[in-house]
Amino acid sequence: MTPSISWCLLLLAGLCCLVPSFLAEDVQETDTSQKDQSPASHEIATNLGDFAISLYRELVHQSNTSNIFFSPVSIATAFAMLSLGSKGDTHTQILEGLQFNLTQTSEADIHNSFQHLLQTLNRPDSELQLSTGNGLFVNNDLKLVEKFLEEAKNHYQAEVFSVNFAESEEAKKVINDFVEKGTQGKIVEAVKKLEQDTVFVLANYILFKGKWKKPFDPENTKQAEFHVDESTTVKVPMMTLSGMLDVHHCSTLSSWVLLMDYAGNATAVFLLPDDGKMQHLEQTLNKELISKFLLNRRRRLAQIHIPRLSISGNYNLETLMSPLGITRIFNSGADLSGITEENAPLKLSQAVHKAVLTIDETGTEAAAATVLQGGFLSMPPILHFNRPFLFIIFEEHSQSPLFVGKVVDPTHK
């Protein structure tokens, strides 16, 4: 008699709050000598870069008319941890779907790289708030394989919770409380429904709160037009910043590139395509170009106008990951026998990723002056982010992409 299938839920959450710092701006050039260049850090950053772009392109393929926002780190971490308990084709599909070449990289190196990344991300920083968390929620009569449990704790800093999934409302509350606490109340009710036979839930969250090194003055924020497409225009609060900024035009991408640093170890890369060049940007962008932008910093006098916004992403990862080759884990052929000691096979019934982004100007303190002084030898560029653009937020030590987004309509949350 074939044993019944028990359900496993994979829940991912991401939060990014970008808040301007009302402190005197730091005008020093970014010191790239402090970057963490260890092999483990470099390995994971390379693969996450490939994975982030592959995932982004799949989202664009599914819908190129809506905002996009997700955390490659959150998604990759959760699936990598799940691979600890997978076997056979299920195991291979997960790691290859995360862009790892299994003939060149050992599984031990992969998990060591994630361990190193999570240690880096959770490193205390007085100026930047960045933390991640992994929760394993296990039915109280289910026994996990000791090897899986030990490696999940050691490599992924996982916390384990025993819950009674027969009491679905109480089980949902335990899981949602974990995510809500980890994201400081920004993501609530992450789980809306649990399948009847759920016995195991893996939840991952990432929280990021950063303050700009070069702050925006709220008094300079004015209502302005944002061109969603050729026929749609919306009004948005447009922030303005002038000064020595890291901005240049990339002919390869047919786009303007703006790098903005946070107090702490994070950088945002904004990509504003020339008129009609969004598709070219999306098809041409690669991790090598982004790496050059991060390493070859150059400042010039410039002025930028960028919308204040709050957007979110909510994705069913089965439809997102399947085109990347991760399919077996979602069907009855899944082999997750390395997770539990029970005879009933596990299948991933749900994989949900939720992410929230806020770029705002809260607070009433006067910002340091960012007014240009003196004359220009040539006219400085003035960038208006008044049409769809992309952005990627990186952790500097590991150069790992924390968040990737596309703003099509800043009025849609």
Curated annotation (Swiss-Prot):
Residues 368-387 are annotated as: RCL. GO terms for biological process: response to cytokine; response to peptide hormone. Residues 1-24 form the signal peptide. It is found in: Secreted. SUPFAM superfamilies: Serpins (SSF56574). Disulfide bonds: none annotated. GO terms for molecular function: serine-type endopeptidase inhibitor activity. Keywords: Glycoprotein, Protease inhibitor, Secreted, Serine protease inhibitor, Signal. The record marks 377-378 as: Reactive bond. GO terms for cellular component: extracellular space. PANTHER family: ALPHA-1-ANTITRYPSIN (PTHR11461:SF165), SERINE PROTEASE INHIBITOR, SERPIN (PTHR11461). This is Alpha-1-antitrypsin 1-5. It comes from Mus musculus. The lineage of its organism: Eukaryota, Metazoa, Chordata, Craniata, Vertebrata. The gene is Serpina1e.
